């Protein structure tokens, strides 16, 4: 199979990268009625598979799970989760032939085998759904001409898809129809109904393309969402301990610091996050973030270029063929890092202390979010897509670090995201260790500086204006208007 994106001419590539429209609430007035009375069969019962299924069933749809025969006879975790939640479970041969909509919600590396298995079993005119377009775009999966191919991609982990639905809300979602597979022109109606059934229409839906979703998703998760959190955690912990900070305190400051800092980001963007700092600290964080952006821009651009060209996918799929040798090796290295093995800290850290003692962490978040956004937009991805794949998802990923450090983050994210995270962090850590961390001053990380520092009013004004007028702040203000009911997610400590 050939990389689908690379088979397109430049005009087609730009058109698909730039496909992005924020859909109006009234476009979902029909809810999920298009799928009422239809048979929806989900393949895969992981975080997205189970939680989307629960939401869709609660929305009145007929949901069942198709699993491999071995998973059923051996009562594996997927079978256990589906049956524990009262779903009908059967083999591919039992359920796929009568399905009107088959949702392939398995991990990326399984998509090709799953599609090859289920496609001959699917009835004429059925639909096939994805929540990530890697198989279609990067692997170039060819789908039977009579099958409609759609995507509904919630912009958060599966657990949050369920929790927000239970609150009567939802999570922002991208939907798309594969232009090569919409024989009856029904794709958009199916995608809208699926998104509505998961609750996505309550939080905002972008009409996108498979191409735009894949390229922006890969970029976000490799850089700011996972790669920067991994690199920043390892570097900041080592710096604190090297300068005499109690390892237990350092571990807690980093583990819960990302979550606390990005909670402000979630509620009011970069501006609110920066406003949580004192004026001298805000100026310093702005200065550090500009330094980071200059230093790291080539690395961000390299990752975007490799994603666009298909180099990243080629490298990762080569590792699949080697039984994930690189992935497992990098995972083991992370598990042995000093931060991952830091002792527990019994004391309390006040919320403001995370900001006051984590000025460089704020700078890393600001620089990473802005760089990821700028790099995606410069590559033809629209601002709305770039926002969701950078700033919006960051608090959700930071929350996983707060639970069980980097181990939890790398367990929750996909193997594709984990592989990309290591690629980025493995380059970012030595770069920042040599050229950035030695430039830090007293008060940038750890104990904050004493009060009484002077502030240049004009410098503060310029920093505030630059932050608030960044394009991600402007589009973020609009998109957050559709998410006014966002709950706090910080687990704190």
UniProtKB/Swiss-Prot annotation:
<feature type="binding site">
    <location>
        <position position="68"/>
    </location>
    <ligand>
        <name>NADP(+)</name>
    </ligand>
</feature>
<dbReference type="GO" id="GO:0009099">
    <property type="term" value="P:L-valine biosynthetic process"/>
</dbReference>
<feature type="binding site">
    <location>
        <position position="158"/>
    </location>
    <ligand>
        <name>NADP(+)</name>
    </ligand>
</feature>
<dbReference type="InterPro" id="IPR013328">
    <property type="entry name" value="6PGD_dom2"/>
</dbReference>
<comment type="pathway">
    <text>Amino-acid biosynthesis; L-isoleucine biosynthesis; L-isoleucine from 2-oxobutanoate: step 2/4.</text>
</comment>
<keyword id="KW-0460">Magnesium</keyword>
<keyword id="KW-0560">Oxidoreductase</keyword>
<feature type="domain" description="KARI N-terminal Rossmann">
    <location>
        <begin position="15"/>
        <end position="208"/>
    </location>
</feature>
<dbReference type="GO" id="GO:0004455">
    <property type="term" value="F:ketol-acid reductoisomerase activity"/>
</dbReference>
<keyword id="KW-0677">Repeat</keyword>
<feature type="binding site">
    <location>
        <position position="414"/>
    </location>
    <ligand>
        <name>substrate</name>
    </ligand>
</feature>
<comment type="pathway">
    <text>Amino-acid biosynthesis; L-valine biosynthesis; L-valine from pyruvate: step 2/4.</text>
</comment>
<keyword id="KW-0479">Metal-binding</keyword>
<protein>
    <recommendedName>
        <fullName>Ketol-acid reductoisomerase (NADP(+))</fullName>
        <ecNumber>1.1.1.86</ecNumber>
    </recommendedName>
</protein>
<dbReference type="InterPro" id="IPR013023">
    <property type="entry name" value="KARI"/>
</dbReference>
<feature type="binding site">
    <location>
        <position position="221"/>
    </location>
    <ligand>
        <name>Mg(2+) 1</name>
    </ligand>
</feature>
<keyword id="KW-0100">Branched-chain amino acid biosynthesis</keyword>
<dbReference type="InterPro" id="IPR008927">
    <property type="entry name" value="6-PGluconate_DH-like_C_sf"/>
</dbReference>
<dbReference type="Pfam" id="PF07991">
    <property type="entry name" value="KARI_N"/>
</dbReference>
<feature type="binding site">
    <location>
        <position position="76"/>
    </location>
    <ligand>
        <name>NADP(+)</name>
    </ligand>
</feature>
<feature type="active site">
    <location>
        <position position="132"/>
    </location>
</feature>
<feature type="binding site">
    <location>
        <begin position="108"/>
        <end position="110"/>
    </location>
    <ligand>
        <name>NADP(+)</name>
    </ligand>
</feature>
<comment type="similarity">
    <text>Belongs to the ketol-acid reductoisomerase family.</text>
</comment>
<feature type="binding site">
    <location>
        <position position="393"/>
    </location>
    <ligand>
        <name>Mg(2+) 2</name>
    </ligand>
</feature>
<keyword id="KW-0521">NADP</keyword>
<dbReference type="InterPro" id="IPR000506">
    <property type="entry name" value="KARI_C"/>
</dbReference>
<dbReference type="InterPro" id="IPR013116">
    <property type="entry name" value="KARI_N"/>
</dbReference>
<feature type="domain" description="KARI C-terminal knotted 1">
    <location>
        <begin position="209"/>
        <end position="344"/>
    </location>
</feature>
<dbReference type="GO" id="GO:0009097">
    <property type="term" value="P:isoleucine biosynthetic process"/>
</dbReference>
<dbReference type="GO" id="GO:0005829">
    <property type="term" value="C:cytosol"/>
</dbReference>
<keyword id="KW-0028">Amino-acid biosynthesis</keyword>
<feature type="domain" description="KARI C-terminal knotted 2">
    <location>
        <begin position="345"/>
        <end position="486"/>
    </location>
</feature>
<feature type="binding site">
    <location>
        <position position="78"/>
    </location>
    <ligand>
        <name>NADP(+)</name>
    </ligand>
</feature>
<dbReference type="GO" id="GO:0000287">
    <property type="term" value="F:magnesium ion binding"/>
</dbReference>
<feature type="binding site">
    <location>
        <position position="389"/>
    </location>
    <ligand>
        <name>Mg(2+) 2</name>
    </ligand>
</feature>
<feature type="binding site">
    <location>
        <begin position="45"/>
        <end position="48"/>
    </location>
    <ligand>
        <name>NADP(+)</name>
    </ligand>
</feature>
<dbReference type="InterPro" id="IPR036291">
    <property type="entry name" value="NAD(P)-bd_dom_sf"/>
</dbReference>
<feature type="binding site">
    <location>
        <position position="217"/>
    </location>
    <ligand>
        <name>Mg(2+) 2</name>
    </ligand>
</feature>
<feature type="binding site">
    <location>
        <position position="217"/>
    </location>
    <ligand>
        <name>Mg(2+) 1</name>
    </ligand>
</feature>
<dbReference type="Pfam" id="PF01450">
    <property type="entry name" value="KARI_C"/>
</dbReference>
<comment type="function">
    <text>Involved in the biosynthesis of branched-chain amino acids (BCAA). Catalyzes an alkyl-migration followed by a ketol-acid reduction of (S)-2-acetolactate (S2AL) to yield (R)-2,3-dihydroxy-isovalerate. In the isomerase reaction, S2AL is rearranged via a Mg-dependent methyl migration to produce 3-hydroxy-3-methyl-2-ketobutyrate (HMKB). In the reductase reaction, this 2-ketoacid undergoes a metal-dependent reduction by NADPH to yield (R)-2,3-dihydroxy-isovalerate.</text>
</comment>
């Amino acid at each position: 199979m050939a990389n689908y994106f690379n088979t397109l001419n430049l005009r087609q590539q730009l058109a698909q990268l730039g496909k992005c429209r924020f859909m109006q609430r009234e476009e979902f007035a029909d809810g999920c009625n298009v799928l009422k009375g239809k048979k929806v069969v989900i393949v895969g019962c992981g975080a997205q598979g189970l939680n989307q299924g629960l939401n869709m069933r609660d929305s009145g749809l007929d949901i069942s799970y198709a699993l491999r025969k071995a998973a059923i006879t051996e009562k594996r975790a997927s079978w256990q989760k589906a049956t524990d939640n009262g779903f009908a479970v059967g083999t591919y041969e039992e359920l796929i032939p009568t399905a009107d909509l088959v949702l392939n919600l398995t991990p990326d590396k399984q998509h090709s085998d799953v599609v090859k298995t289920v496609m001959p079993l699917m009835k004429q005119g059925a639909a096939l759904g994805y929540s990530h377009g890697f198989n279609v775009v990067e692997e170039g999966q060819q789908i039977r001409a009579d099958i409609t191919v759609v995507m509904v991609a919630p912009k958060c982990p599966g657990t949050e898809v369920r929790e927000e639905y239970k609150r009567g809300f939802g999570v922002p979602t991208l939907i798309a129809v594969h232009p090569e597979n919409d024989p009856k022109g029904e794709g958009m109606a199916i995608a809208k109904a699926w998104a509505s059934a998961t609750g996505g229409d309550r939080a905002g839906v972008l009409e996108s393309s498979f191409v735009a979703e894949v390229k922006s998703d890969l970029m976000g998760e490799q850089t700011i969402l996972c790669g920067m959190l991994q690199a920043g955690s390892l570097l900041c912990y080592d710096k604190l301990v090297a300068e005499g900070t109690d390892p237990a305190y350092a571990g807690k400051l980093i583990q819960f610091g990302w979550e606390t800092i990005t909670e402000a980001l979630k509620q009011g963007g970069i501006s609110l996050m920066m406003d949580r700092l004192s004026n001298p600290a805000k100026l310093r964080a702005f200065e550090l973030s500009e330094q980071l952006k200059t230093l790291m821009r080539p690395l961000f651009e390299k990752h975007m270029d490799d994603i666009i060209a298909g180099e990243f996918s080629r490298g990762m799929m080569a590792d699949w063929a080697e039984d994930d040798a690189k992935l497992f090796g990098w995972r083991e290295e992370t598990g042995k890092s000093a931060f991952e093995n830091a002792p527990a800290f019994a004391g309390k850290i006040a919320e403001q202390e995370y900001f006051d003692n984590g000025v460089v962490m704020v700078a890393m978040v600001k620089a990473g979010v802005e760089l990821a956004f700028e790099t995606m937009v410069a590559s033809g991805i629209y601002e709305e897509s770039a926002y969701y794949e950078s700033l919006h998802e960051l608090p959700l990923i930071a929350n996983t670090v707060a639970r069980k450090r980097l181990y939890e983050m790398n367990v929750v994210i996909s193997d594709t995201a984990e592989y990309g995270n290591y690629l980025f962090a493995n380059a970012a850590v030595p770069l920042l260790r040599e050229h950035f961390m030695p430039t830090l001053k007293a008060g940038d990380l750890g104990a904050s500086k004493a009060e009484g520092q002077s502030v240049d009013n004009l410098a503060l004004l310029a920093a505030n204006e630059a932050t608030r007028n960044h394009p991600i702040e402007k589009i973020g203000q609009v998109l957050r208007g559709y998410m006014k009911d966002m709950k706090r997610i910080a687990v704190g400590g």
